[in-house]
Amino acid sequence: MTEISMLNDVQKIIVLDYGSQYNQLIARRIREFGVFSELKSHNITAQELRDINPIGIVLSGGPNSVYADDAFGIDPEIFELGIPILGICYGMQLITHTLGGKVVPAGQAGHREYGQSSLRLRSASALFAGTPDEQLVLMSHGDAVTEIPEGFHLVGDSNDCPYAAMENTKKRLYGIQFHPEVRHSVYGNDILKNFAISICGARGDWSMDNFIDMEIAKIRKTVGDRKVLLGLSGGVDSSVVGVLLQKAIGDQLTCIFVDHGLLRKNEGDQVMEMLGGRFGLNIIRVDASKRFLDLLAGVEDPEKKRKIIGNEFVYVFDDEASKLEGVDFLAQGTLYTDIIESGTETAQTIKSHHNVGGLPEDMQFELIEPLNTLFKDEVRALGTALGMPDEVVWRQPFPGPGLAIRIMGEITAEKLETVRESDAILREEIAKAGLDRDVWQYFTVNTGVRSVGVMGDGRTYDYTIAIRAITSIDGMTADFAQLPWEVLKKISVRIVNEVDHVNRIVYDITSKPPATVEWE
């Protein structure tokens, strides 16, 4: 076994996954305190946790009821390990139910709570040190604890929740009914930090330098003297993977840059110049644009697009790998956010990702995914720690399927050109305005909608381009960027004047959720 958590000299807090779509945020928040944290299945045993040797355990929230026939449980011996445990929402209910307390099912006694609620602290607790006696928290539960297990005492309540926080300090067990990992819990970060630092005794000394050392050791142990093939997409993720792999295994790495005809303007030449020339990666450039575009002709469904691109991407790799000797591994830039949006054992699929579930079952490679425990902002920090320049590290995120998922409906050469050119204008103007670090991600979309316009003295019937610009910290949630009107106006004027077959620009003002970042 070669997981990071096997490296016993690194303190870590393990988050057990009970299905909340935001459970990765718990690990993300803990990492902000300089403590390594990762998710594990709720099926993990007490002995497996002993082997990992964490300094703390968090039981995440989840959509289930502890009374459901298929409810996710826990190995009860975990509570006897002597390791501090924090149960969040479902996690608190699971502690209560397992240790002999009482949880009331949804619909009884009006215990449902959704949205911000006022938490009132009733007794002092190390978990809430430095926070006010009354504070806003995000509640999202139907079931509720009405009797706490023996040895526990009440810490806090709310108007509709008689036990919103409880603890057993002797056994170092803590439960909170709200979600501290989301920003709507005003002092949530303080609570998680108290758990990690004060209760678990974390040193707070984990950093990207630690990650580099751990991941290099993991890669070398996994790969040995075998060879790795990496697909470069031109985005930040695959570029960082390439530099990390080269640092770990040197010339055992061969990179294939597949030009599928769906790249941004001048992307291919920039990738070769930067990663091939400046960083010395061994890159094979493959022009497979006709191959991809022929397969995508007439395809409108976004999931079919993703699957076609994911499958064909690996088949191109097969073709190129057959020309090489002894290639056993395919490396990908899969992130934590890719994994959760593609669905896990405990969470439903939001959409498939080209890096997760979009690969053919008969693929001849083993997978290496060095970034699959990181969020996007952490990948940028990793790139900086690896010595990569800002123009690479802060490059706009770009999905593996490329512009295919920024074109609604069928992909045509005309639509591709509208997105490619409008996106270049958008990126240029955002940079000129000095907003390229403030806006987390920005791109254009061909909506597939045509509308009537007037240009010169003639009537037009051309495409509508949508601008998507968001602010975010980790990609799990996002708000639309409130760009200055003068910047939006300049972008709009330039696009309709400089890009053929476009006569209307709209601005996407939807947050995530309910929308995802990409349109498809």
From Swiss-Prot:
Keywords: ATP-binding, Glutamine amidotransferase, GMP biosynthesis, Ligase, Nucleotide-binding, Purine biosynthesis. Residues 206-395 form the GMPS ATP-PPase domain. Its EC number is 6.3.5.2. Residues 12-205 form the Glutamine amidotransferase type-1 domain. The keyword Nucleus does not apply. PANTHER family: GMP SYNTHASE [GLUTAMINE-HYDROLYZING] (PTHR11922:SF2), GMP SYNTHASE-RELATED (PTHR11922). This is GMP synthase [glutamine-hydrolyzing]. It comes from Streptococcus equi subsp. zooepidemicus (strain H70).
